[in-house]
Amino acid sequence: MSEQIVKIALPGAGGRMGQMISSLIAHSDDMQLVAAAERKGSPMVGMAVGDIAISDDEASLGIGPGGVIVDFTRPEATMTLLDIAVVSKTAMVIGTTGLSNEQEAE
């Protein structure tokens, strides 16, 4: 059986969970961080997470089929990321808390 490396896009890469997740990815043999982003104006934009520079372009997280967006951001950001995931056909894992009933229904 051939092993596939799962490509990960990480919004909120500079946050507490983002840093923890990027560390776990760095120590994994079957995951690779391929995109990282922070909100516009964040002092983390341009800094490196491993070999990846943190971007402020959310669209860069839509890495396509075979990739996964791992989201632990804020509800408003999650909804934007969900649209990006749908359009780019990127799977998404949502760990964001505080979603409204309407947001969860969407």
Q: Language-model segments: which ranges?
A:
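Residues in the short beta-alpha loop(s) of Rossmann-like NAD(P)-binding domains
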Residues: 14, 37-40, 98
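Conserved Rossmann-like nucleotide-cofactor binding loop
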Residues: 16, 42, 75
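Short acidic low-complexity segments
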Residues: 32-33, 50-64
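Rossmann-fold NAD(P)-binding glycine/threonine-rich loop
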Residues: 76, 81-88, 95-106
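NAD(P)-binding Rossmann-fold cofactor-contacting core
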Residues: 27-48
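N-terminal Rossmann-like NAD(P) cofactor-binding module of classical short-chain dehydrogenase/reductase
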Residues: 69-70
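Extreme N-terminal starter segment of soluble prokaryotic enzymes
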Residues: 3-8
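N-terminal Rossmann NAD(P)H-binding glycine-rich loop of SDR-like oxidoreductase domains
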Residues: 10-14, 18-22
